[in-house]
Amino acid sequence: MNLQLQSDICNLKSQIKITGSKSETNRLLLLQALFPNITLANTSNSDDSEVMQKALKGNDEIVDIHHAGTAMRFLTAYFAVNEGREVVLTGSPRMKERPIKVLVEALQQLGAQISYENEEGYPPIRIKGQKITANKVNIPANVSSQYISALLLIAPKLENGIELTLVGEITSIPYIKMTLALLNEIGVETSFEGNVINVKPLTTHERQRIGEANPKPQTLTVESDWSSASYFFSIVALAEIGTEITLSSYKQNSLQGDSSLVEIYKNLGVDTVFENNSIVLRKSVTPNPQLSNCNLNSSPDIAQTIVATCLGLGIGCHLTGLHTLKIKETDRLEALRMELTKLGANISVTNDSLTLVATKDINPNVKIATYNDHRMAMAFAPLALKAPIIIENAEVVSKSYPDFWEDLKRLGFIMERV
């Protein structure tokens, strides 16, 4: 499905409810599978979270997670400690191109039985679940934080917990801290000192409290997704002064790294006010003429949104810390270069950075390829406030935000299938 979008005016005051964070939901789903008396509220309705939940509840020998990268990493660790079960974990053609070797080797250090079905280092992989007693493991610090989180999430189930040493410079710290905070929330003792993370096994008392006997259930509420909020920050930035969008449900002391949006978008003319469990976004000032040296090492998922916003505002930007974007749903840096160039942008990329030169005009009615990447579709959509735009394969948004197009209609966007 291709959608043509246009909007001359965004409704000046709107309210949108966004479902729970995909990142938090997927972590908590794994913990719930390990400790069944945990119950969850406000979980994500994304395809990725549904795939994760289905895989955790199912009994299939072949587990296909399609495009869900988080599920691939987390389930690799989960099935490694699921005693007595053997599975083949596979995914889409793109997933089979995304490396898994670093995580597999780390789990093998602990004693896990994992082998490759085809090419070494890549899915599909065969996992034979077993009891793991080793607890010391090293992993490169500059890899995807999902590898690190996968190991941390299974740690309270291990007989001796885990002592994880991160080798080199650490990236994506907020996602690691999110995982540790969620473990703390269910009563797991953790520490993160220097480059060493310790996660203790749950005591007998704590195991009973969260579900290994028959205790009173514990309910955890998932905060709404900040990555999904980013598209509304972009819409407000590109709209006229006075535009206001209220989003729920959000915390000022969020665990999500993408909450850095609040400070970044101040430079782009958006004020954020926390009211009860909501955030109110207001377009109040003219943006700065340049967004310089914006380091997204801790929040790379909002890079596409930010650069599209800057193009729409006619300002330049220089974004760094983007090295993980090359192994996402697509090579996001190259995809951005290709699609922004179609719109008339002057853009250059390296392995870990992006530079956009200020451009006054945007080419209208350009077809934006989405590369099976939900964030490409959603990041470019707000540009319809500046020029009509066509989003190819628009249904890809269901990976993280199935209601996205309906929510844009509520804001006054006009869309037509083409």
PLM features: residue spans?
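Short, structured segments at the rim of ligand-binding sites
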Residues: 1-418
